[in-house]
Amino acid sequence: MKERILQEIKTRVNRKSWELWFSSFDVKSIEGNKVVFSVGNLFIKEWLEKKYYSVLSKAVKVVLGNDATFEITYEAFEPHSSYSEPLVKKRAVLLTPLNPDYTFENFVVGPGNSFAYHAALEVAKHPGRYNPLFIYGGVGLGKTHLLQSIGNYVVQNEPDLRVMYITSEKFLNDLVDSMKEGKLNEFREKYRKKVDILLIDDVQFLIGKTGVQTELFHTFNELHDSGKQIVICSDREPQKLSEFQDRLVSRFQMGLVAKLEPPDEETRKSIARKMLEIEHGELPEEVLNFVAENVDDNLRRLRGAIIKLLVYKETTGKEVDLKEAILLLKDFIKPNRVKAMDPIDELIEIVAKVTGVPREEILSNSRNVKALTARRIGMYVAKNYLKSSLRTIAEKFNRSHPVVVDSVKKVKDSLLKGNKQLKALIDEVIGEISRRALSG
């Protein structure tokens, strides 16, 4: 019965949602027509009740009948001391600088980061309730952005709380310096007594560093036992932190663990637009789409690519078209990632440039002599130089098969009669095609 219920739920949610929200989900018990589900923490419990109530309700009714009901419980971690309430003390201010651009408003939410985003936002709104929060994911996926967004949100909305953002390297260096100077007690006072929300970035830096791990373990315990919020970021999940003390890894896992996945193409496009908005810049939609499609390894590189295009535009005074963007971003794009421009589309672009006739007019029904000549040159070069089929040429130039045959014949006859001006234009078009091919 348990497996039937789980399978029924699984058929009603997509794979990504199942992995994000149901990884700790299980049927705890079935008592008559009542199903008790169990999840890993309060955040997931509340999220499932809010977003998936109808899914769960329908699933249990299908298996157990229309009178079936359900409830969701979660396994709460018992802290070392009797203190278990969310953080309520309010004191001073921000103890370390935060990047003001890292806010929840500037974070673009997509399928791959939705869970981590909402978890971080809930932690910011309710410090101490979901504790600790452990966010992990690859380089440049937004871990630091979320981490500092928590800090910025708390500073804006709970100005009396003391917020500290540090990298694990800074934690290590502070520990070493305090030991050299005989100020270990001051170090512990700083990190255990004088902070209400501790945000630790790049914890994987402490792999193999047993001494500092021990100090972090005791710092963690004291903060957690006092109901103080801890948020940790890493490039890998807790159980893959090799050479980390098991007791510390277990502490990381006892709260909320959220993964950041690489954004899909649509999310990258939204992120690219947000970056343009922040930089007060503009780029053509086709250029923005090209960047989102091809610069996909991490968001830092995506931002770097956009900044490069904006700087080029500002310093040269030129608009950035697709061809220019491809050339400018060669170093940002993995080999063979750029989708090759369709040969005839590129040919039409070149013919437009050489003849001075806009692409739209070449493809229109205009009988203007210049447009007619440009159109015929394009079809002739496509047939005799690119070796394209008549059917393909007809489709690309929006013409019938007989019109293409007639246009190619007219250009050929004119060349045989010694039309030097026409030959010069064709040679220039072919020369530009060759130049582009050689430049990659």
Curated annotation (Swiss-Prot):
Compartment(s): Cytoplasm
Main location: cytoplasm
Cited PROSITE patterns: DNAA (PS01008)
Residues annotated to bind Mg(2+): 144
UniProt region (Domain IV, binds dsDNA), positions on chain: 314-440
GO biological process, one term: DNA replication initiation
Keywords in alphabetical order: ATP-binding, Cytoplasm, DNA replication, DNA-binding, Lipid-binding, Nucleotide-binding
Sequence segments annotated as region (Domain I, interacts with DnaA modulators): 1-69
GO molecular function, one term: DNA replication origin binding
Segments of this protein annotated with the region Domain II: 69-96
Annotated InterPro entries: AAA+_ATPase (IPR003593), Chromosome_initiator_DnaA (IPR001957), Chromosome_initiator_DnaA-like (IPR020591), Chromosome_initiator_DnaA_CS (IPR018312), DnaA_C (IPR013159), DnaA_dom (IPR013317), DnaA_N_dom (IPR024633), DnaA_N_sf (IPR038454)
Residue numbers binding ATP: 140, 142-144
Binding locations of ADP: 108, 113, 140-145, 300
Chain residue ranges for the region called Domain III, AAA+ region: 97-313
Subunit and partners: Oligomerizes as a right-handed, spiral filament on DNA at oriC.
PANTHER family in the record: CHROMOSOMAL REPLICATION INITIATOR PROTEIN DNAA
Family membership noted in the UniProt record: Belongs to the DnaA family.
Function text: Plays an essential role in the initiation and regulation of chromosomal replication. ATP-DnaA binds to the origin of replication (oriC) to initiate formation of the DNA replication initiation complex once per cell cycle. Binds the DnaA box (a 9 base pair repeat at the origin) and separates the double-stranded (ds)DNA. Forms a right-handed helical filament on oriC DNA; dsDNA binds to the exterior of the filament while single-stranded (ss)DNA is stabiized in the filament's interior.
Domain notes: Domain I is involved in oligomerization and binding regulators, domain II is flexibile and of varying length in different bacteria, domain III forms the AAA+ region, while domain IV binds dsDNA.
Protein name, as recorded: Chromosomal replication initiator protein DnaA
Gene: dnaA
